[in-house]
Amino acid sequence: MAVPKKRTSISKKRIRRNIWKKRGYWEAKRAFSLAKSISSGRSKSFFVLQKNKQ
């Protein structure tokens, strides 16, 4: 079984965690932006079928 030889420093842990969190932030921002464009009807990359209420 693979075991790390030495303990990872706190600063290295913090850097890696911040990279991980920042990636999540940008993904969430992109998803929210896409949702806003779809809901407002200004989306250029998605075709949403509108159901007619009759």
Curated annotation (Swiss-Prot):
One GO biological process term: translation
GO molecular function terms attached to this record: structural constituent of ribosome
Keyword Plastid: yes
Keywords, sorted A to Z: Chloroplast, Plastid, Ribonucleoprotein, Ribosomal protein
Main location: plastid
Keyword Signal: no
One Gene Ontology cellular component: large ribosomal subunit
Subcellular location: Plastid, Chloroplast
HAMAP family linked to this entry: Ribosomal_bL32
Family indicated by similarity: Belongs to the bacterial ribosomal protein bL32 family.
Name this protein carries in UniProt: Large ribosomal subunit protein bL32c
